Amino acid sequence: MMKMLLGGNETTRKIDSYAINELRIPSIVLMENAAISFTKHIGKNEDNFLIVCGKGNNGGGGYAIARQLFSKDKNVKIFCISDENMSNDCSVNYEICKNSGIEIFYKLEELDKLLLECDVVIEGI
């Protein structure tokens, strides 16, 4: 059985900082690896996803997860909290999602309908 280690926000920040600053792993690579790992644990019966994305690195992770799910032929919709002043990694993943044809919604009035249509909501704020 695989051993899983859990840590809080501060531990995660320290691990990320070490990986980025000492090991020189670009943060976008860490984000992509996290998205790939996350989507490996999605059940086969879940097909309709709503990913709510902010403008920081959590949002970037949400966009990366959206891309991974979309590549597995899942029905993916994104609700974008803001497309202004995004972190660099968030902006990169946002642009890839837009260019890939993933539906992105921006109006709060659309959120109720999106929530009713999905099986799973993923929060990336």
Task: Indicate where each model-derived feature is located.
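Positively charged, low-complexity intrinsically disordered leader regions
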Residues: 1-47
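Glycine-rich phosphate/dinucleotide-binding loop and adjoining beta-alpha-beta core of small-molecule
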Residues: 2-7, 46-52, 57-125
